């Protein structure tokens, strides 16, 4: 009798341990929350004034690849890229936004010849490893153009036109080593005064 009770107690204890382990596993590793599909909006890059001055002094003129746009705002350049798709968390702003168009830098070699450096299909990745990337070269290789500092990013939500919107702003963009090397190689007169490229803002319309 005692032997049967002992075996039953042991079985119940073992079942309790297994159940507890399973519950802990579910609590420790919950499934990741998926971001919401992005159906529109825009990514903007506002160059820092010192960077804008370095471009001007170095004889480099910024331009855009349609459907992106470019505007002079005070002593800075504002690139605007329409968002084509992606996925963002409405709560944290973490995710990925793909845009159309691109940016071009032109530099004069002689009175009649110019050199260009272009980047298209920009993508902003926010979150733990935040970067701004673009496609460059005949092989269509994607390169990191800038690393993004998300430590002071301002994430806000709003509603307009029957859609939810997420804005991720105040994100400093630091020029990547690859982009810096490309710029100084193609445009020898260009000498960036700092690695900070500018500030990136993502305003995304969610599905």
Model-derived features: where do they sit?
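Intrinsically disordered, low-complexity boundary segments flanking structured domains
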Residues: 28, 66-68, 134
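Predominantly extracellular/secreted and cell-surface proteins with exposed
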Residues: 70-144
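Bacterial N-terminal signal peptides
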Residues: 16-27
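N-terminal membrane-targeting segments
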Residues: 13-15, 31-34
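N-terminal segment immediately downstream of the Sec signal-peptide cleavage site
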Residues: 33-94, 170-207
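Extended amphipathic ligand-handling, pore-lining, and cofactor/metal-binding catalytic surfaces
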Residues: 129-178
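Intrinsically disordered low-complexity regions specifically enriched for long asparagine
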Residues: 11, 28-29, 114
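Bacterial N-terminal signal peptides that target proteins for export
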Residues: 2-17
């Amino acid at each position: 009798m005692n032997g049967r009770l002992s075996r039953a107690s042991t079985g119940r204890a073992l079942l309790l341990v297994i159940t507890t382990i399973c519950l802990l596993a579910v609590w420790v590793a919950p499934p990741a929350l998926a971001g919401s599909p992005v159906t529109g909006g825009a990514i903007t890059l506002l160059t820092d004034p010192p960077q804008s001055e370095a471009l001007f002094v170095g004889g480099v003129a910024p331009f855009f690849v349609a459907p992106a746009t470019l505007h002079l705002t005070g002593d800075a350049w504002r690139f605007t890229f329409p968002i084509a798709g992606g996925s963002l968390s409405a709560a944290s702003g973490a995710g990925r936004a793909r845009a159309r168009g691109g940016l071009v830098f032109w530099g004069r070699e002689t009175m009649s010849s110019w050199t260009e450096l272009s980047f298209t299909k920009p993508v902003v990745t926010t979150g733990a490893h935040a970067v701004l990337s673009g496609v460059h070269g005949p092989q269509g290789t994607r390169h990191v153009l800038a690393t993004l500092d998300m430590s002071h990013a301002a994430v806000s939500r709003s509603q307009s036109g029957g859609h939810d919107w997420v804005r991720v702003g105040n994100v400093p963009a630091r020029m990547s080593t690859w982009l810096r090397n490309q710029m100084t190689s193609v445009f020898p007169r260009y000498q960036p005064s700092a690695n900070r490229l500018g500030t990136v803002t993502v305003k995304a319309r969610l599905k």
